[in-house]
From Swiss-Prot:
InterPro entries listed in its UniProt record: FAD/NAD-bd_sf, GIDA_C_N, MnmG, MnmG-rel, MnmG-rel_CS, MnmG_C, MnmG_C_subdom, MnmG_C_subdom_sf
Chief place where the protein resides: cytoplasm
Protein name: tRNA uridine 5-carboxymethylaminomethyl modification enzyme MnmG
Family recorded in the similarity comment: Belongs to the MnmG family.
Task of the protein: NAD-binding protein involved in the addition of a carboxymethylaminomethyl (cmnm) group at the wobble position (U34) of certain tRNAs, forming tRNA-cmnm(5)s(2)U34.
GO biological process: tRNA methylation; tRNA wobble uridine modification
Amino acid sequence: MQNSFDVIVVGGGHAGTEAAAAAARLGVRTLLLTQNLDTIGQMSCNPAIGGIGKGHLVKEVDALGGIMALAIDQAGIQFRTLNASKGPAVRATRAQADRSLYKRAVRRLLEDIPALQLFQGMVGDLLMEGDRLGGVILETGLVLRAAQVVLTTGTFLGGRVHMGDQNYPAGRAGDPPSNALAQRLREMAFPVARLKTGTPPRIDGRSIDYGVLEAQPGDAPPPAFSFMTRRIGVPQLACHITHTNARTHEIIQTNLHQSAMYGGHIQSVGPRYCPSIEDKVVRFADKASHQVFLEPEGLDTHEVYPNGISTSLPFGVQIELVRSMRGLENAVLLRPGYAIEYDYLDPRELHPSLESRRLPGLFCAGQINGTTGYEEAAAQGLLAGLNAARRARELAAWTPGRHEAYLGVMVDDLVTRGLDEPYRMFTSRAEYRLQLREDNADLRLTPHGRALGLVDDQRWTAFSAKQDAVQAERNRLEGLRIHPGSAIAGRIAAKTDQPLSRDVTALELLRRPDWDYASLLQVLDLVPCSDAQACEQLEIECKYAGYVARQHDEITRAARWEGTDIPADMDYAAVRGLSTEVMQRLARQRPQTIGLASRIPGVTPAAVSLLLIHVKRRGLRQAG
C-alpha cells in the first residue's frame, strides 16, 4: 500500500463516505480510513434516510453527484412523501432502509471510484511537519501522508456509552472510541465541547402482536431519492404504530432517577427535536401518550426499531416500559437502548469551506461539527471532500449560498452562529425555501456540480435531457391557445364554473390555483410528457413563478452587499460606532464577508451598516 495521498478521510460513516467519494471523483488520490471496513456506511441509529429538511439535503447531495440517494434507492424497503398535502416547498421524501442492503450499496459505490482507496486502521494522531499538517499517524505507528485531512469522526471522538448508572468508552455499542485523537485535538487547543445522543432498544418482530396495531404502508409507486433512479426494485414493507400510555409514563417517572441523564451521569445536551422518552415524559407532562413507530430493520431480519423511545434507562426498566405498550406485551428485546456522549469542535472555528481556521488543510464534517443526522453529515462530507480536493489542486474553495441550497443554509448557520445543542436541518431555517425544493435540487446544483467536476457524463446527460423535456413541455403548453367559445373552452367552463373571457394559453391555465397538470391535460385531451420528473418540475415552477420572482428580487438586493469581502487584517476597533460587544464578536470570528458578519448573533443591522461603510471607505483609500 502507498503511504502518500492528496486527501485522507478519517471515518467511514455518512460524512466520511461522501467526503471520500467527492474528493476521489475530482481525480485526486484519496484514502478513506476507518477502524472497521465492514462497518462502512453503517446506520448507527435509525434505519431511515430523509424527512422534513433532511430529504432536501439528500436530493442536494444527489444533484452534486453524491452517493446517499443512490444507496437508499438500492436499499429502501418503504418510501413515503411527507407533507404530501402541503405545498411542494415543504414536501419531503423519507425511506426506511434495509441496513445490510444500505451498507453493501455504499461499499459498492465507493469501490467503483478509481481514485479511492480504502484502508482499515485507527487514527491516533495528526502528523505535523512544523506548523503544517502532513497527514495522520495510526495507533499502530503507521504514517500516512496528505496535506489535506478530513475528520468525520461521528460519535467516536471521546465517545462514552451510558445505560442507567453504567457507562463505558465506545464510539457506539460494540465499537471502540477514538480517544487518542480526541486527546490530541484537546492538546492542540481546539475548542472542544461535549454533546449527547441516544438510541432505543431493538425488538424481535416475532414477539410483536401486529394484529392490534395500525399499519403504515409506503407510497405506491415508491418515490425515489436519486434523480438517476427510474424505479425502486426492492420489496416494500409496512411500518406499524403503537403509543405510550399512562402505565408507560408511570414506569418512566418512577425510575427517572436511574436514567443516565436524569441521574446526573450525563451533563451534555442532546438533540432538541429527537428527545429521549424520558425527556418527552418530563417536558410534555400534559401529554397522555406519544407515538412509537415500529420500523423493520430489513428484509432478512426480524429486528424492529421502535422509533420514539430512545432511552438511557437501565435495561430491566427498558423491558418493562416496552412491554407496557399495546402490541408489545410479550416483546423480546434484542439490543438495549443507550445514550452516548462525544466530543465536537466549535464549528465557528471553520471557514465556510469546512476547513479549519486554526490548522489549514484540516477539514471537519458531520457530528464533529455539532450536527445530528445522517443527511446533515452526508451533505457536509461532500462539501468538505470537495474543498479538500480543490485545495490539493490549489483551486479556490466552493460553498453554495443560503439562496442556493439547504447545504448553504446549514454551513452558514454553523460557521456564523455556532450551536449549543445538536443542529438538525428544517425547512424553516431557510429564508428562500420556496425555491429550495426537492424537485429542483438538480436544477439548482447539478450545473455547479458539473463545473466542479463532481457530476459525470451519465448524470449530466440525464439532467440535460430532463431540462430539455421541461422546456419542450413548456413550449407545447404555451403554444396551445384556447379561444372563448371553442369546444375546449366549454369543457374548461364546465370544470371551473367560469367561462373564458379572453384567449388563454394552456400554460396560463396551469399557473392558476384551481388547475393541476393531470386535470389540465385531461380537459385538453393531451398525453403527458414522457418524463414524470419533468412534468412535476414544470407544474411546480408554474405555481410558484410569482413567489419565486419576488424572492429572486430579495436575493438580488441582498447580494449587493452580501458578498462584499472583509479584509483578513481588518481592525474592528477602527470601525467608528461599533459597540464593544459587537467588536469582540467580529474580532473573534473574523467573518470573510459582510453577509457572514450580518448573521453572527449579536451583530445588529446598524453594526453591519457601519462595517460596510468602513470597508468601502478603506477600499477607496487603498485604490486612491
